[in-house]
């Protein structure tokens, strides 16, 4: 009986061995008949779907935005699109990187960069708006100045040590413009945000500045007991200063308790100004592979814009309106064509918003009012930038009125 069992076990073993061997042979034969993708083909496919976006430091709102875009848009199939965020230096360098670096397709830059570069070197940047164009406005970058409690206004910073963020960062570029406009001279330092906050708490610094979309992660870590607050920047807080130029070049903005519960008391706001962060791209020839890749990205990004209205995404996505126009900039052709082809499709992250800043009807009504008011009052016509600022204030007024009406119901 034991011999029979041994024979059976041996037969089973031989059968399994034969099956495994035949299966392995069949698999090898199938692979031989249909070889895998070659190294060169895989390399070509990988490059054909990749687009790069240069951003500032990792704590910048632009980095979080680009990460969100990557997470929503990425499709690693051979015919898909892949977004590669690149950490750059920020400031004017991001725009220079898009303009001059051959491996950079797009970048997140601030609206005033175009004007500032043309002012610095009119010859080099003479036609920059034809070489780098905007895809869409992303969010507002608030000018945030955090100070010790013994500092009450910008004038109190004269001669004191103020951190302008890293050298040539967007914060330094804009802070330089604003402090020069105010005629306030300070002792500058260029620490990163985390180090600057520690030096501010210790009393070594009187203030630190960050220009980015609020809430900013470094400021969000500040505690009430740290003895710090934000400085207001408006005509009421600086009555002896002429803020006309600042109002013409920057948007009115405010920091709220909801953004910074430990820094802004409930029921109050801190007025300031803001720049607009734009997604821009290099204008490759329309028949080139790189232009076609950016056009594919635009289609994927714009088509999925509603997916960014999610609690898992940065709250600043609520400000995005793909159709918003930027004075002084030229719209990237692929983006303009997409918007023209999707006029009836929602182009905001929150399509249920009733106050659409780029609504053609609302904007046209505002422009008609300005023309009639200007001709009847005899006042000097406003510049495009001044009209944009006034329109932003008009939209804010409408928004507040809508809230009051809802509360009264």
Segments from the language model and where they lie:
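Pocket-lining segment of extracytoplasmic ligand-binding domains
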Residues: 111, 121-122, 184-287
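Extracytoplasmic small-molecule ligand-binding "clamshell" domains
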Residues: 49-54, 61-109, 267, 381, ...
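C-terminal segment of classical bacterial N-terminal signal peptides
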Residues: 19-29
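Segments of small-molecule ligand-sensing domains
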Residues: 271-381, 385, 405-409
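Bilobed "Venus flytrap"/periplasmic-binding protein-like clamshell domains
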Residues: 48-76, 81, 141-202
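Pocket-flanking alpha-helical
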Residues: 70-71, 84-126, 197-199, 215-223
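Extracytoplasmic
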Residues: 46-50, 78-80, 90-93, 101-103, ...
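Bacterial N-terminal signal peptides that target proteins for export
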Residues: 2-15
